[in-house]
Every structure is written in structure tokens, then in C-alpha cells.
């Protein structure tokens, strides 16, 4: 199959593209740095010519909720319109477990909800894949607020998944038929985000004092079980400990 991956130079998109290629598929990498701009549509029609499926694993720059909504809205509309022109038969969207159950969350969550809405209402057959936070999310979250060796971070309850594991799931789904809303995809164990950040920073040699708080980018709308997968979730194999032992990559 010919499968395009949007966000192919990113953390999950790059891994997904590699797994698809390892599976024998013809992969088209879509990224602004590779000459395809989802915001303007430049290069998009040429990139999707002959494509059977598209995986959307793009992320957004760290901006306001309004700007993130505009970014995800524009890029998703452009991508879906180009897919329809090209006759693409399957749009696979990487999303986030729990975002439909909350009104708040980060700016990124606001944008992902808009992506889901556009995909569900669009003309291209689709699969939305809700995943839990990735194993590297805790280290990233602590870096958002770090100042002079001190970082605030919310004590979220999460069930994180290894980046390689979710990329393999996306590659598998992209090679098959559209499935609508897929089951939640998660790692095997629940974790506390503060402890994850502490252990990640230790492995990476970072000296950061962590201060647990809900007064930050991750707020009380994300507390409790809201970010945990449903009972029928697909559970990926790699534990957080195994990911750390492999060098936190």
C-alpha cells in the first residue's frame, strides 16, 4: 500500500513511517521541512497522489488554545480536502484518551477535539485512535515549567504507552480498513506523572526539583481517572520501567 504520514519528522509520525516501511509499504513522509505545508496546502496534492491511506500524527506549536484550535482546524481541513481530491480511502487520526470527557485540558487537547470533530464529519472514511500519554510525556511536561532547576508538574494519574508501541498500532491500523472510533490504546500500568518525571530526569541526568501542583498547564479538569483507558482498551506490552531501561527513548 501507499501510505502517507503527516507529521513524519515528529516523535510518533517518524516511528510510524519506519514501521510501515519495515512492513513493505510505500511511505510518503509529509512535513513542512520536507516541502509539504499543511497550513497552506503547498505540496499536498502531489504528496497524496496515489495514496491509499493517511496517518495524521501532527502536533502543534506551544501556543494559546485559540491559536492551537486554528492550527489544527486549518491543517485538518486542508489534509481532508486533499485526501478527498486524491481518492484516499482511509484517514487515521492519532488522538488522546479522555479528551471527550473533559471541557478543559491543555491547548493541545482543545485542538485535538477539533481534529476529531472534523474527521468524524468529513467525507473520507476514518479511524480515530485514542492513545494515553506517552512514556516521554512526564519529562516533557516538567520541561514546560522548569526555571533554575525547579519545575511544577501536576500529579496526574496516567497509564502511559511507549512511543514505539503506539506507532506500531497506527501502522497496523493504517494498513487495514477504516474502523471508526477505535478502542482506547494504553500501556500496561498506571503511573503518577510526578514520579514518572522524577525517574525520567534521573535516567537522563537532569537535576530538577519537582513541585506537584494543579496550578499549571495540566489542571484539575484532568484529575482522577479521566485520562485512564476504558475497560475494553487495547493494552500495549512495554512498561515504563522497560522504556527507562532502554534509555528513555
Predicted features along the sequence, with ranges:
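A conserved pocket-lining segment of Rossmann-fold NAD(P)-dependent short-chain dehydrogenase/reductase
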Residues: 126-127, 140-161
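Glycine-rich Rossmann NAD(P)(H)-binding loop
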Residues: 153-157, 183-190
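Non-catalytic, hydrophobic alpha-helical segments
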Residues: 12, 54, 166-170, 185, ...
Amino acid at each position: 500500500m501507499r501510505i502517507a504520514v503527516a507529521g513524519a519528522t515528529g516523535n510518533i509520525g517518524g516511528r510510524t513511517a519506519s514501521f510501515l516501511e519495515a512492513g513493505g509499504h510505500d511511505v510518503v513522509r509529509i512535513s513542512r521541512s520536507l516541502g509539504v505545508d499543511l497550513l497552506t496546502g503547498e505540496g499536498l496534492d502531489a504528496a497524496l497522489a496515489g495514496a491509499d491511506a493517511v496517518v495524521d500524527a501532527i502536533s502543534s506549536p506551544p501556543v494559546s488554545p485559540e491559536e492551537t484550535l486554528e492550527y489544527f482546524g486549518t491543517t485538518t481541513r486542508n489534509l481532508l480536502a486533499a485526501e478527498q481530491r486524491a481518492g484516499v480511502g482511509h484517514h487515521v487520526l492519532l488522538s488522546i484518551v479522555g479528551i471527550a470527557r473533559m471541557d478543559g485540558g491543555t491547548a493541545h487537547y482543545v485542538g485535538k477535539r477539533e481534529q476529531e470533530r472534523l474527521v468524524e464529519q468529513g467525507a473520507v472514511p476514518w479511524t480515530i485512535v485514542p492513545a494515553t500519554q506517552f512514556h516521554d510525556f512526564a519529562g516533557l511536561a516538567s520541561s514546560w515549567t522548569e526555571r533554575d532547576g525547579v519545575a511544577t508538574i501536576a500529579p496526574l494519574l496516567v497509564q502511559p504507552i511507549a512511543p514505539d508501541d503506539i506507532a506500531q498500532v497506527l501502522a497496523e491500523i493504517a494498513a487495514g480498513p477504516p474502523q471508526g472510533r477505535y478502542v482506547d490504546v494504553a500501556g500496561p500500568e498506571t503511573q503518577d506523572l510526578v514520579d514518572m518525571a522524577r525517574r525520567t530526569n534521573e535516567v537522563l541526568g537532569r537535576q530538577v526539583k519537582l513541585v506537584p501542583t494543579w496550578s499549571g498547564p495540566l489542571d484539575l479538569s484532568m484529575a482522577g481517572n479521566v485520562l485512564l483507558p476504558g475497560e475494553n482498551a487495547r493494552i500495549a506490552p512495554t512498561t515504563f520501567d522497560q522504556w527507562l531501561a532502554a534509555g528513555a527513548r
